[in-house]
Amino acid sequence: MSKRVRERSVVSDETAKRIRQNEHCHAKNESFLGFCNLEEIDYYQCLKMQYVPDQKFDNDFILTVYRMANVVTKQVRPYNSIDEKHHYNTVRNVLILIKNARLVLSNSVKKQYYDDVLKLKKNTDLESYDPLITVFLQIGESVNEEIQKLRKALVNIFTNKPDKSDINNPDVVSYQFIFGRVQKLYNRAIKQKTKTIIVKRPTTMNRIQIDWKTLSEDEQKMTRQEIAEKIVKPCFEQFGTILHIYVCPLKHNRIIVEYANSESVQKAMTVNDDTRFTVTEFSVVQYYNVAKTEMVNQRIDIISKDIEDLRNALKSYT
């Protein structure tokens, strides 16, 4: 770490420490003497007493000094050693400050000298603030001037009608055009987001279902591939490009044909009028429901036949 970085770190840490100290250095905090910079507070602040110029010195004042000394001492009584830390200050330094404050303020002569010094110090401090106050006033004037300029600019925005002939020219920098430009950019963005998007229709939507009542004896001997190539394809490829032909494994007289486009589907629907085929638009839900029902019925028939064969076999043994 460079020397400059280390110095900045130390300054930053010291500043943070001082800020934390100042946040808790007030009479409402029971442990305030642990946070205050003991060199910066006076004896009255140490004892939580209000400084009053030309304060009357009597027995009541002395009793108040002793009473408040006992009050502020309570914050360091829990410690076992005067070398322990009471937050940021040692117990020793806190007790020394309390002791000095009690001795000075309870003695009329010492108190008078101390009050004179304190009064002089406060007057000196006030004088030292004068240049700073002057700087603040100058800053305030500058800020006020900028506020007035901003106010005039806002008035121009909402009252003056600009010449919109150059509104689309990005080289023209004028606050009068800002709302017009924002509106045009917004409308352009909305059109871009809401423009029509053309989505290509999937070929899986271009399917038809072909049924016919019964298969001839020759057709019953055909395989699924032969049915597709010899019966379905010659009849339906005239309507368009066929991508797939699917023959139902449970029912060979039910075929699914997938075309390349929807126009072919519409043309194929016309074969109902002059052929033995019944053509409908393919529905996945309907197809699978029918297929499952037929599969269940076939299995029921097989089980019933097996039961009947078993009964006949049992009769032969009786």
Curated annotation (Swiss-Prot):
Molecular function per GO: nucleic acid binding
Gene3D superfamilies given in the database record: 3.30.70.330
Superkingdom, natural source: Viruses
Name used for this protein in its record: Uncharacterized 37.5 kDa protein in LEF8-FP intergenic region
Lineage per the UniProt record: Viruses, Viruses incertae sedis, Naldaviricetes, Lefavirales, Baculoviridae
